[in-house]
């Protein structure tokens, strides 16, 4: 059984303040820290061979906190792919106790452009609820200077196909800690959702989603798998 575990990061400080975050690098709130730890409890008995996160700290914090109680007791280490010599481990014994963690901006949250840092309610008052709904929930309409969900998928899906999927085909169990929209674009592809269906897909913070790769397709498991 080869597993793909997807996890939206725990609540960030700006989630808590109801602000558009996007690529602004904001850490987890206290609640988000607890959500990440709780998420780790729910997956602690699932095998994990590789971890992938975005380059944003809330994604990295969530992955590291989630792994603190993993039953394998293995330690995640960040692989600096631009300088592989920096993170090379020269002890086979220690290598066996580690899990590589790779970061990529391809997994970053959707970039919200001129909305970043603004309060969602205030933006709705300024531009109208219908316009903001189009920016947030339509598939191809982007906010000013930002990305649509379609645009986000244009970077997440190639990275998944080129970097992550080959590892699943090798039987590696993968844990991805990322963001609401980058994960929605992946799930759209995994579950073959239409442009209309993906608009109603909501991902709560700190709740893992587990798929099994059968060699032919991805099958979604019940939350109690862990």
UniProtKB/Swiss-Prot annotation:
Binding site for substrate: 8-15, 21-22, 58, 109-112, 120, 136-137, 180-181
Record-annotated site: Transition state stabilizer: 179
Active site: 9 (tele-phosphohistidine intermediate), 109 (proton donor/acceptor)
One biological process term in Gene Ontology: gluconeogenesis
EC number(s) given by UniProt: 5.4.2.11
Record's keyword terms, sorted: Gluconeogenesis, Glycolysis, Isomerase
CDD domains registered for this protein in UniProt: HP_PGM_like
Disulfide linkage: none
GO molecular function term, any single one: phosphoglycerate mutase activity
PROSITE patterns in the cross-refs: PG_MUTASE
Pathway named in the protein's UniProt entry: Carbohydrate degradation; glycolysis; pyruvate from D-glyceraldehyde 3-phosphate: step 3/5
One of the Pfam families matching this protein, by short name: His_Phos_1
Chemical reaction(s) catalysed: (2R)-2-phosphoglycerate = (2R)-3-phosphoglycerate
Function of the molecule: Catalyzes the interconversion of 2-phosphoglycerate and 3-phosphoglycerate.
Family: Belongs to the phosphoglycerate mutase family. BPG-dependent PGAM subfamily.
PANTHER family xref list: PHOSPHOGLYCERATE MUTASE
Annotated protein name in UniProt: 2,3-bisphosphoglycerate-dependent phosphoglycerate mutase
Organism (species): Chlamydia trachomatis serovar L2 (strain ATCC VR-902B / DSM 19102 / 434/Bu)
